[in-house]
Amino acid sequence: MSNVVVCALYKFVSLPHFESLREPLLSMMEQAEIKGTLLLASEGINGTVAGNQAAIDALLIWLNQQNGLENITYKLSFDDEMPFYRTKVKLKKEIVTMGVEGIDPLKVVGTYVKPKDWNALISDPEVVLVDTRNDYEVQIGTFKNAINPVTETFREFPEYVKQNLDPAKHKKVAMFCTGGIRCEKSTAYLKEQGFEEVYHLEGGILKYLEEVNKAESLWEGECFVFDNRVAVDHDLKKGQYDQCNACRMPITEAEKLTPDYVQGVSCPHCIDKISEEQRKRFVERERQVNLAKSRNEAHIGSDVNHVIEARRQKKEALRKQSAEKNKAKQANA
């Protein structure tokens, strides 16, 4: 039996004084030796943490005692090793960042579909099935016949909808994500845009894998998760993928054998995207990691989100440039 319990949780709820929750929540997690990150915002709480069973039970009890955080949505999985290095509670503007003002899942949201009913819904030929996750997540697994919007961040999803979905044409839209939280916002957004029949998988992919028999499953591949496991299989056990420590993309054993892969420095996905300055920094970080290992010490490593953010900014700049060119063409027409 795996002795590390991984708990993914979220709840959309009005928390006008969410800042005051940070210190007591962080203190509780540290005392219970829980690692991972929880996000707090005026719209609720979201995150994934891990610890022993008693610690996770204590956290859920603590949250249930806080005003507004009763009956929080959570999913448990298990691992042999702690998948997180740090304990964090962050204050945010949104608990899942879409970047669109006024989207409130507490006011309007799509129709929840339980895992046992999901296969029937997505087998309907009139249903447009959309994976709301990022492209690197979709690449290693998704539902049969699902559309991949090819987004790098959730911020790009509204633009995908504007360019590709039409409420007059697409009468039934079903969406899914890892644990359900992104679909809370994506379905709320579609409802705001005039789509009438909008559905989403209750509990997300993780709940589906937990409850639906593999023989009946329409899931193909593995499910990306945002911790050191990288991905889980249909049994919610650690999958076959590793992760590039430079760009955080999931990588296969075959990709690790290519010349582009250098442990902790680059992989085929990011070899052409990292700067020389970044490469040098990653080389030094890897040297420090190996030095710590030789001393039998823990090394947390540095934050590599700047690589992902740089990629997002570059794509956004290209999108704006394209939009400006289209405006110029229309003006000259």
Swiss-Prot record:
Alphabetized CDD domains for the sequence: RHOD_YceA
Name a single GO biological process: tRNA modification
Q: What is its EC number?
A: 1.14.-.-
Q: Known catalysed reaction(s)?
A: uridine(34) in tRNA + AH2 + O2 = 5-hydroxyuridine(34) in tRNA + A + H2O
Query: SUPFAM superfamilies, alphabetically?
Result: Rhodanese/Cell cycle control phosphatase (SSF52821)
Tell me which residues this entry annotates as catalytic: 177
**Pfam families xrefs:** Rhodanese (PF00581), UPF0176_N (PF17773)
Any one Gene Ontology molecular-function term assigned to this protein's record: oxidoreductase activity, acting on paired donors, with incorporation or reduction of molecular oxygen
Q: Mind telling me which InterPro entries this protein's record contains?
A: Rhodanese-like_dom, Rhodanese-like_dom_sf, TrhO, TRHO_N
What are the protein's UniProt keywords? Answer: Oxidoreductase, tRNA processing
Rhodanese domain: residues covered: 123-217
Q: What does this protein do?
A: Catalyzes oxygen-dependent 5-hydroxyuridine (ho5U) modification at position 34 in tRNAs.
Regarding protein family, the annotation reads: Belongs to the TrhO family.
Official protein name in the record = tRNA uridine(34) hydroxylase
Q: What is the lineage of its organism?
A: Bacteria, Pseudomonadati, Pseudomonadota, Gammaproteobacteria, Alteromonadales
